[in-house]
Amino acid sequence: MEFPEHGGRLLGRLRQQRELGFLCDCTVLVGDARFPAHRAVLAACSVYFHLFYRDRPAGSRDTVRLNGDIVTAPAFGRLLDFMYEGRLDLRSLPVEDVLAAASYLHMYDIVKVCKGRLQEKDRSLDPGNPAPGAEPAQPPCPWPVWTADLCPAARKAKLPPFGVKAALPPRASGPPPCQVPEESDQALDLSLKSGPRQERVHPPCVLQTPLCSQRQPGAQPLVKDERDSLSEQEESSSSRSPHSPPKPPPVPAAKGLVVGLQPLPLSGEGSRELELGAGRLASEDELGPGGPLCICPLCSKLFPSSHVLQLHLSAHFRERDSTRARLSPDGVAPTCPLCGKTFSCTYTLKRHERTHSGEKPYTCVQCGKSFQYSHNLSRHTVVHTREKPHACRWCERRFTQSGDLYRHVRKFHCGLVKSLLV
């Protein structure tokens, strides 16, 4: 005997408990914002929270602090509402912010939907689109359809779905439609690029300038970006703006310097290591002789490892984004003077204004490429290092992005993953 309304009732009761703070056994911190929630719901909806609570000791699970440079409080609030309601509201909030938060939390169904939105937006803004009524060279990409992950009886009852997934409509006869590419950015990479990337193995990027030599202005970079990062297409529309500031000339680094950083670990042990080492920068005594050194792409300081460089970059991004604010004292929602869009806080409005002005304040010292958002620069740095820090625990194959590792595990080790999630 089935009770199709049971799933909807369960979500409704959990939502009421969260609003009242009843039986909430954890608190998620995003900047200064606090979100009480239930661990079971977070772990069921997010791979990030599942791994966090699985690896953390029992006494340190009450508080979870997310990276405020990637996840904004309004975006996480929308994702938290989705976990408890089965609905995702993208109104009055930049899709890029929701995509960044969903990628960080490994909520891949939301990642697919947000990328589809951005792809459709880019196609609508492309001046090369065919006129209405003209036959396109290729059929348009199908738009993901929301489907409930419940039994058929629950769909008849029109209840809010507990889990959602993006499903493509059945393929019609004729030439095959183009597919939405599965990019390798789903943990940190936050936007789009057409076409899949082929995995290539490169040695670490070691530059050939002597350590004691002075930098020469106008020198050509020795390492070029051979392919755009998946995150860089979110700035494609703004790159056409005539007000885009010129890129500074690239500055070569010293011999033996490896430019790069390592993505933040998802496990509890790595998070504890990051918290213990926060704020500690490498001095000249710590660098020591021998071994590859890492250079900061923003200030050119040297560090003994990519982990210490990651800590240093986080301090940079906190300084640049420290002007984050909430609603104005009079309670009026911040509004863009150019397009009239309203935002939940002035910080998101400031980020949105970059799409109009073309401002790209974050610049890679190695190749001179500029980015609108700090996390895009962090992910772009991996292009120079060719690092592959994400290793499959079952076959030891390594990947540059955690999204590649996720799809590899889902394709080749699906049975093992299901056994872990039980």
Swiss-Prot record:
Alphabetically ordered keywords of this record: Cytoplasm, Disease variant, DNA-binding, Metal-binding, Nucleus, Repeat, Repressor, Transcription, Transcription regulation, Zinc, Zinc-finger
Renumbered residue ranges of the record's region Disordered: 121-141, 166-188, 207-256
GO biological process, one term: negative regulation of transcription by RNA polymerase II
Compositional bias (Pro residues): 243-252
Cellular compartments annotated: Cytoplasm; Nucleus; Nucleus, Nucleoplasm
GO molecular function: DNA binding; DNA-binding transcription factor activity, RNA polymerase II-specific; zinc ion binding
Zn-finger (C2H2-type) residues: 294-316, 334-356, 362-384, 390-413
Domain BTB: 24-92
Effect of residue 397 to H: In LCCS6; loss of function mutation
Tissue localization of expression: Expressed in skeletal muscle (at protein level).
An example Gene Ontology CC term for this record: nucleoplasm
SUPFAM superfamilies, per database record: beta-beta-alpha zinc fingers (SSF57667), POZ domain (SSF54695)
Function as written in the Swiss-Prot or TrEMBL entry: Transcriptional repressor. Specifically binds DNA and probably acts by recruiting chromatin remodeling multiprotein complexes.
Associated clinical condition: Lethal congenital contracture syndrome 6: A form of lethal congenital contracture syndrome, an autosomal recessive disorder characterized by degeneration of anterior horn neurons, extreme skeletal muscle atrophy and congenital non-progressive joint contractures. The contractures can involve the upper or lower limbs and/or the vertebral column, leading to various degrees of flexion or extension limitations evident at birth. LCCS6 features include severe polyhydramnios and absent stomach, in addition to multiple contracture deformities.
Sequence similarity: Belongs to the krueppel C2H2-type zinc-finger protein family. ZBTB18 subfamily.
Annotated protein name in UniProt: Zinc finger and BTB domain-containing protein 42
Organism: Homo sapiens
Source taxonomy: Eukaryota, Metazoa, Chordata, Craniata, Vertebrata
